[in-house]
């Protein structure tokens, strides 16, 4: 969600702060700002909208100073205006914040009664006023920081400047991530290591409850009680990452076309392509012995988990309990300490998923993390980490991370089946051989379907509602297709199990309703054809995504039929996701929306 950066050193910082913010644009934001201390005075520039607006403001009114903090805001409390943009100032204090202060209304009333005058609608401003109050009460800077942290409740990552200390940034973490970067004669602060990659690859991650005093030559870290603590310094792999679209119009387009390569890379970590066997990955979770598996995630990662559920239950005969992370821990699920749980998150920082992970840890379950960021909080708090190895994904709408999550879950399910004795050695080899073929087939599909997709997308861009249908693993895929379309084109779309058509959605069908049916010629195909006939009988405009055999067998008039290669069931979700991604992408391009940073969305949702 929001992005935080800070630099303290001997060189001017404002331009470098903005460059660091650009590396956090993928998180989503609606306003931005920078504050520095120059000649003993706090100064700031803020702007609504994209970073180009802030850059324009800085060209008109440059900021000097060798210490500064900066922020991209994703609105939670208060409208996305310049007035509500961070940094927030009170007397002698500048604050940037990612998160939600849950008791801000109570604190605001208390501070206002004491004479504080609030200038914004944000929850963050109470932090600045608390710090000013404690300084007026005679507390030193560190004492004021510690006292403030004792008062605020909720999730926060904070960076603070005190006007009377032009050589120190203070920071705190409780929930959203914060990374401290170590330089030579300068230090850095960022919401993640990607922001700091141009400056340093030596990173220290704060953990929940930590707060830090960062100077030019080092950092002092304290726990919530004020005790000095040590946190390990590590080398980040984010340093190799460059924000570059290459020859593509958008990051999303680039990431769609990267999928054959990144999936081949990911699978190489989990299977032996020569012997067509799965590779043992972790001793921490024994899939051969666990009686059941829980899966929790949000958004697209949750839909990947739903598909994974089919695989674990079919190939490993392993019962799976799955729910969206925001609901998971409130259901009071009876959990067995002998069971295991998988948590799926691209960023590894998703707040609801992390909370569900901690809920399962409290109940004694073994924890596995299916993440893209191996240095993330979810990864660090898990017993086993299953990296998806997708590389940085900048587009807010997930594409390559989704298919890499599926590839990893498929490999884990086959490995679990082998460990449980529910698939034979020959079946294991056949399944792994199918997985090994997947990158080649994905490349073939991406090179062949674009013209048809573009033509169809032009028509879809004129629609107001779209229905997606599927059975088996194509049902979660239908939900994913609908999610992609609504995320980036802002067209209302819903994904349903095809068998549920008669239980409500059929009431929406008329000659204006496109119905996208995902129907490989599998064991569900005949039933899905029956559903298509019901749509056709009511004048619905059918868009069929199937394979050669399905196209020949359907015998239905369709608005469009997209024909894909015939593939094994275990790789069908990854192959059939490609036209869904391209359909959403090109429709959004025709609609003229901000494809990579769609309105109101954030890449990494770090608050509940």
UniProtKB/Swiss-Prot annotation:
InterPro entries: GATase_2_dom, GFAT, GFAT_N, GlmS/AgaS_SIS, GlmS/FrlB_SIS, Ntn_hydrolases_N, SIS_dom, SIS_dom_sf. Its EC number is 2.6.1.16. Keywords: Aminotransferase, Cytoplasm, Glutamine amidotransferase, Nodulation, Plasmid, Repeat, Transferase. It is found in: Cytoplasm. It holds the Pfam family GATase_6. Its main location: cytoplasm. CDD domains: GFAT, SIS_GlmS_GlmD_1, SIS_GlmS_GlmD_2. Disulfide bonds: none annotated. It catalyses: D-fructose 6-phosphate + L-glutamine = D-glucosamine 6-phosphate + L-glutamate. GO terms for biological process: carbohydrate metabolic process; fructose 6-phosphate metabolic process; protein N-linked glycosylation; UDP-N-acetylglucosamine metabolic process. One of its GO terms (cellular component) is cytosol. Residues 281-422, 456-598 form the SIS domain. GO terms for molecular function: carbohydrate derivative binding; glutamine-fructose-6-phosphate transaminase (isomerizing) activity. The keyword Transferase applies. The keyword Phosphoprotein does not apply. The active site is at 2 (nucleophile), 603 (for fru-6p isomerization activity). Residues 2-217 form the Glutamine amidotransferase type-2 domain. PANTHER family: GLUCOSAMINE--FRUCTOSE-6-PHOSPHATE AMINOTRANSFERASE, ISOMERIZING (PTHR10937), GLUTAMINE--FRUCTOSE-6-PHOSPHATE TRANSAMINASE (ISOMERIZING) (PTHR10937:SF0). Involved in the production of the root hair deformation (HAD) factor specifically on medicago. This is Glutamine--fructose-6-phosphate aminotransferase [isomerizing]. It comes from Rhizobium meliloti (strain 1021).
């Amino acid at each position: 969600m929001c992005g935080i950066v800070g630099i303290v050193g001997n060189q001017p910082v404002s331009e470098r702060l903005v460059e660091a913010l650009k590396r956090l644009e993928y998180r989503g934001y609606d306003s931005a700002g920078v504050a520095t201390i120059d000649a003993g005075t706090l100064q700031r520039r803020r702007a609504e909208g994209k970073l180009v607006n802030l850059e324009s403001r800085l060209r008109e009114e440059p900021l000097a100073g060798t210490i500064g903090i900066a922020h991209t805001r994703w609105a939670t409390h208060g409208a996305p205006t310049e007035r509500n943009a961070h940094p927030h100032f009170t007397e002698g204090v500048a604050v940037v914040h990612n998160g939600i202060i849950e008791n801000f209304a109570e604190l605001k009333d208390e501070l206002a009664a004491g004479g504080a005058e609030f200038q914004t609608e944000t929850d963050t401003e109470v932090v600045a006023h608390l710090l000013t109050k404690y300084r007026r009460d005679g507390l030193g800077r560190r004492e004021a920081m510690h006292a403030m942290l004792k008062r605020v409740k909720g999730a926060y990552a904070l960076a603070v400047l005190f006007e009377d200390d032009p050589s120190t940034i203070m920071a705190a973490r409780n929930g959203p991530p914060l990374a401290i970067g170590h330089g030579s004669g300068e230090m850095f602060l960022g919401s993640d290591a990607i922001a700091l990659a141009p400056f340093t690859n030596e990173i220290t991650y704060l953990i929940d409850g930590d707060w830090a005093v960062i100077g030019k030559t080092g950092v002092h870290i304290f726990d919530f009680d004020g005790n000095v603590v040590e946190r390990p310094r590590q080398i980040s792999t984010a340093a190799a990452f460059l924000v570059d679209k290459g020859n593509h119009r958008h990051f999303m387009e680039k990431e769609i076309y990267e999928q054959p390569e990144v999936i081949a890379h990911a699978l190489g970590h989990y299977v032996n392509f020569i012997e067509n066997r799965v590779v043992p990955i972790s001793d921490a979770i024994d899939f051969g012995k666990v009686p059941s598996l829980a899966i929790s995630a949000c958004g697209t990662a949750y839909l990947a988990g739903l598909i994974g559920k089919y695989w674990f239950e079919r190939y490993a005969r392993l019962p799976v309990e799955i729910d969206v992370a925001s609901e998971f821990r409130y259901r009071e699920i009876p959990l067995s300490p002998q069971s295991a749980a998988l948590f799926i998150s691209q960023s590894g920082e998703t707040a609801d998923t992390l909370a569900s992970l901690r809920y399962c840890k409290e109940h004694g379950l073994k924890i596995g993390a299916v993440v893209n960021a191996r240095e993330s909080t979810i990864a660090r708090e898990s017993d086993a980490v299953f990296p998806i190895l997708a590389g940085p994904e900048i587009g807010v709408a997930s594409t390559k991370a989704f298919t890499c999550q599926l590839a990893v879950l498929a490999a884990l399910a086959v490995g679990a089946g082998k460990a449980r004795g529910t698939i034979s050695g020959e079946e294991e080899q056949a399944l792994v051989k199918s997985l090994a073929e997947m990158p080649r087939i994905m490349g073939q599909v991406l090179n062949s379907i674009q013209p048809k997709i573009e033509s169809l997308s032009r028509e879809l861009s004129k629609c107001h509602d779209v229905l997606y249908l599927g059975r088996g693993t194509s049902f979660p895929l239908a939900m994913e297709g609908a999610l992609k379309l609504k995320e980036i084109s802002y067209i209302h779309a819903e994904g349903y199990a095809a068998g549920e058509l008669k239980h409500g959605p059929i009431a929406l069908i008329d000659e204006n309703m496109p119905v996208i049916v995902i129907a490989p010629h599998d064991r569900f195909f005949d039933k899905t054809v029956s559903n298509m006939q019901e749509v056709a009988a009511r004048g619905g405009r059918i868009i069929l995504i199937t394979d050669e055999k399905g196209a020949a067998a359907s015998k239905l008039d369709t608005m469009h039929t997209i024909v894909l290669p015939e593939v094994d069931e275990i790789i069908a979700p990854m192959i059939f996701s490609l036209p869904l991604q391209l359909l959403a992408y090109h429709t959004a391009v025709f609609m003229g929306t901000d494809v990579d940073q769609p309105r109101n969305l954030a890449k990494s949702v770090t608050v509940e």
